[in-house]
Amino acid sequence: MSTYLIGDVHGCYDELIALLKQVDFTPGQDTLWLTGDLVARGPGSLDVLRFVKSLGDSVRLVLGNHDLHLLAVFAGISRNKPKDRITPLLEAHDVDELINWLRRQPLLQIDEEKKLVMAHAGITPQWDLQTAKECARDVEAVLASDSYPFFLDAMYGDMPNNWSPELSGVARLRFVTNAFTRMRYCFPNGQLDMYCKDTPENAPSPLKPWFAIPGPVTNEYSVVFGHWASLEGKGTPENIYALDTGCCWGGDMTCLRWEDKAYFIQPSNRQLDLGEGEAAAS
């Protein structure tokens, strides 16, 4: 039994299947972890959702910002942008079933035995693991409820950007969503910066990548995340694994086999344009 962790799929169904064949992934024996952003940009979002859903207990995933945006488009809150290439999904006969499955997926995955944590954008250094669990449950409960469209309508925005246990209501849910699905940079005190999307060497002072600021979770656990394609999987501490390597922008789809830390790469079927990716991603 092996554990395979794969970065953002973004509708790149053919590359996902090729990568799983490359590692001889066997559902029922192996477990697949996915860093979120299953949909948008690539041509096969519908096939990706159908396939991942079919894996049942053999897959563990987290929601990304593009997955949440899909839910908002489905609910009539956000506009369907042609560049996301999700129209075939929205028009599919089983779209209701797929959406209801997707909105019941978590924001956080934890394996205590492996001391492994996964979230789409990472874990803010302002949280310990118990706080992260509680915050994830808050958003997950709303997404799984009948009132999820009201949350999706209120989730867009960059404030508040500083964690406090006193946060409540929409402000709390928005901070949690941004921390789990959109975060890249923090100020030295852990406060989120939601504007900078440059690579770390070009980021203005005093901003630092979230993983460069010591926090309770990263001090005790390994953390796997996606979201940040321009990192190209590089520049993180030894126990932090950046797995989004920009497949939908012409980069690669990356898989990490946890047991021996072996990497496997599947080249994209698209022409390389990582600059396009970071400019377009939220």
Curated annotation (Swiss-Prot):
This enzyme's EC code(s): 3.6.1.41
Keywords: Hydrolase
Catalyzed reactions: P(1),P(4)-bis(5'-adenosyl) tetraphosphate + H2O = 2 ADP + 2 H(+)
Enzyme class: hydrolase
Highest taxon of source: Bacteria
Pfam family, any one: Metallophos
PANTHER family found in the cross-reference section: CYTOCHROME C5 (PTHR40942:SF4), PTHR40942
Entry function: Hydrolyzes diadenosine 5',5'''-P1,P4-tetraphosphate to yield ADP.
Name this polypeptide is given: Bis(5'-nucleosyl)-tetraphosphatase, symmetrical
